[in-house]
Every structure is written in structure tokens, then in C-alpha cells.
A protein has these predicted regions:
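Conserved small/polar residues in nucleotide/adenosyl-binding loops
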Residues: 107-109
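Mid-chain, well-packed structural core segment of small domains
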Residues: 72-93
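A short structural micro-motif
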Residues: 30-31, 67, 85, 98-105
């Protein structure tokens, strides 16, 4: 595996927790394993390891994106990740509320 893959797997474990990552990797099939490798290398190893934003900020952005995309299962895991990254409950709540005004309410206008 590449250096980005290894760094990504480490960051993914730090953010999401070992149990979450072990479950994701353990549930991977021959068909989905390349997707797990891609996510580790490019999302976690390529984007989450960049120096331009603190991890807590990246977590809040991820929560906003998952809210806008209506991905409740992924959102649940990343709320735990945001807490692991030092985000407060208030910051998470305000991020979700702010995003909901734009991403969810506008579909009813």
C-alpha cells in the first residue's frame, strides 16, 4: 500500500475510532475492498492529512456536506468523529442547524 493509504488509515482510526474502521474494513467484500482502499488513500490520506484546515473544521464541513446530501447513517458516524476531533456539542448543533436552513428548507420553497 502507499504512504497516503497508511497515513489515511491512521487518521481514519483517530477520527472515527478503531471499532468503526474495523467494522468497515471487516465488512468489505472482494467487490467493495477497492472502494475502502480508495477512501483510505484519497479521502483520509489525501484530504484529511492536508495542513490547510484543522481537523475539527474538516469535521464540521463534513457534517454540513452529509446533512446537505441527506446521508443520516454517515452523519451519525461523523458526529462521533467530530467529537473525537474536539468539536463541542454546541458547535456540532450550530453547524447542523445552519446547514439545515439552506440545504433542507430550500427544497420546500
Amino acid at each position: 500500500m502507499s504512504e497516503n493509504h497508511d497515513r489515511g488509515l491512521q487518521v481514519r482510526r483517530e477520527v472515527m475510532g478503531d471499532a468503526f474502521v474495523d467494522r468497515a474494513l471487516g465488512n468489505a467484500s472482494e467487490f467493495t475492498q477497492p472502494l475502502q482502499d480508495f477512501v483510505n488513500e484519497h479521502a483520509w490520506g489525501g484530504v484529511w492529512t492536508r495542513s490547510g484546515l484543522p481537523r475539527a473544521t474538516r469535521s464540521l464541513i463534513t457534517l454540513a456536506a452529509l446533512t446537505a446530501l441527506k446521508c443520516p447513517q454517515e452523519l451519525k458516524g461523523h458526529v462521533r468523529g467530530a467529537l473525537n476531533n474536539g468539536c463541542t456539542v454546541e458547535e456540532i448543533r450550530e453547524t447542523l442547524l445552519h446547514c439545515a436552513v439552506y440545504a433542507l428548507s430550500l427544497i420546500h420553497i
